[in-house]
Amino acid sequence: MSFRIGHGYDVHKFTSTKKNIILGGIEIPYEMGLEAHSDGDVLIHALCDAILGALCLGDIGKHFPDTDMEYKNTDSKFFLAEIKKMLDDKEYSISNIDCTIIAQAPKMLPHIEKMKACLASVLEIQINQINIKATTTEQLGFIGRKEGIATHVVCLLNR
């Protein structure tokens, strides 16, 4: 059996020109949105990078550049579904995914199970293969000042 580990990170800043955020493929009510070329889903973007990294296929920007208008306002679940095809083509499967959301606000706990279900559906895996946890920065830095959200994702692939 062959194993590969990938790590992904993403961050986006809040903007007052949007309401609500998209995170883990679901909409979360909030007074602001995330500034981005696509839908700004930092969790899916980091997950895409983790999978691509484990496959040695670069990063999300290589495959879906934010300079390409084709991807303007794109639902990030599309990116994840395309990367799932790459995963299948390389004959790897996901063993598990571990995600950390770093946000002062909004509160994530009420939304984690829906995020897990959404990601599991797109990736065609079991919900118990995905862990999502959230933390704050104790009001330190740009995240603590509620200026944005960051995520880290680690995935383990096997063949």
UniProtKB/Swiss-Prot annotation:
Cofactor binding note from Swiss-Prot or TrEMBL: Binds 1 divalent metal cation per subunit.
**Chain sites annotated for binding 4-CDP-2-C-methyl-D-erythritol 2-phosphate:** 10-12, 37-38, 59-61, 64-68, 103-109, 135-138, 142, 145
Q: Name one GO molecular function term.
A: metal ion binding
Output the InterPro entries linked to this UniProt entry. Answer: MECDP_synthase, MECDP_synthase_CS, MECDP_synthase_sf
Kindly list the positions annotated as binding a divalent metal cation: D10, H12, H45
Q: In this chain's numbering, which residues are marked as the site (Transition state stabilizer)?
A: H37, T136
What does the record give as its pathway? Isoprenoid biosynthesis; isopentenyl diphosphate biosynthesis via DXP pathway; isopentenyl diphosphate from 1-deoxy-D-xylulose 5-phosphate: step 4/6
Q: Which reaction does it catalyse?
A: 4-CDP-2-C-methyl-D-erythritol 2-phosphate = 2-C-methyl-D-erythritol 2,4-cyclic diphosphate + CMP
Q: Which domain of life is it from?
A: Bacteria
E.C. numbers: 4.6.1.12
The cofactor named in the record is: a divalent metal cation
Q: Which UniProt keywords are listed?
A: Isoprene biosynthesis, Lyase, Metal-binding
Entry's family note: Belongs to the IspF family.
Self-association and partners: Homotrimer.
The task this protein performs is described as:
Involved in the biosynthesis of isopentenyl diphosphate (IPP) and dimethylallyl diphosphate (DMAPP), two major building blocks of isoprenoid compounds. Catalyzes the conversion of 4-diphosphocytidyl-2-C-methyl-D-erythritol 2-phosphate (CDP-ME2P) to 2-C-methyl-D-erythritol 2,4-cyclodiphosphate (ME-CPP) with a corresponding release of cytidine 5-monophosphate (CMP).
Its recorded name reads 2-C-methyl-D-erythritol 2,4-cyclodiphosphate synthase
Native organism: Francisella philomiragia subsp. philomiragia (strain ATCC 25017 / CCUG 19701 / FSC 153 / O#319-036)
